[in-house]
Amino acid sequence: MMPFRTQPDALVPNYNLSVQDVYTDTARILMTSHGTLSLLSHVEDPSHRRIPNLPSWVPDYSVVQDPYALQYRGPCYWKASGNLTWSPNILTMANGELEVTGYHLDTIDKTSTLQTELEDPSAFWATIVKLASTLELPYPDPGNSNETPGRIELLWRTLTTNTYNRTYPAPSEIGSLFIDYILNLQIRHRLTPWSSSDEFQPHHSPLSESVYPDWRTLFRLEPPESPYSWDRYRKRLAMVVESMFDGTYSPIGLAQLQHEFDQGSGSRRRLFKTKGGYIGTGARSLGKGDEVWILHGGSVPFILRPQHDGYHSLIGESFVYGVMHGEVQSLSLPRRQVTIL
């Protein structure tokens, strides 16, 4: 591992140093030897940190990393900052301050809940559907890709970090798989079994509308020609129900999609929307008012939280649909110097 392969004395044991100093020195040496900000993707969620008074940009090596960094989702080769490089300030890093250069892409204004924060699994999806329904179209296209994804496509591609079975970008046919996934969710949520001690309830509806995902509204927002239109969804629903009665339907193909959701979102990462209409997924602890930054030398966007006197703290890495390959350079955003504590 760099730099220890070529510089075996890069870290010298010093038992007079505190744990915080040892971790900070390790992070500084790893980052300066690589010349990138890739180590920031290995910083765990703030809620999982055990070592107190550790700079927010320094990983807490005493905890297990969960989730793994986005780079392990597959051979994605994200390069959010394009060819822009990071110039380290070794002196300030030794004092716990990380100086970076970058672009404030946008500010988070809406977030979803996590599976672990709600008792009812349908309520988890209700917050996701509600967030997706607020997306304005056309979606921002800083890379001039001329693509015009609808809200449902934006949703599933973001929840999976646009990756399926280690393939990036995810094949378009995964959209059809997502439709079947939604159908299975609705059947499971609406037909939740009642207690065996209860009598038959022909109009049993265990969920209040406030926690039930409003998929119908989301589908009806799609144009008629969309593969995710309301009419196509209803036809697929009829086909699935018929195949269930025939005994020919098997949802086993949804297992891989569930795995992608578990890794890209679920209980591990929180879905968010920005004021400017971007959708993304990031650290559990992100919240309204946090900022999305593209930093020189960073392969993915990062979530920073403004602190006192213009400083920032690192919340974690993120996936933001549409800005993962250097598109930020075409936005004419002001380049800023930021210090992360």
Language-model features and meaning:
Residues 2-341:
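Acidic/Ser/Thr/Pro-rich low-complexity tail/linker regions in eukaryotic proteins
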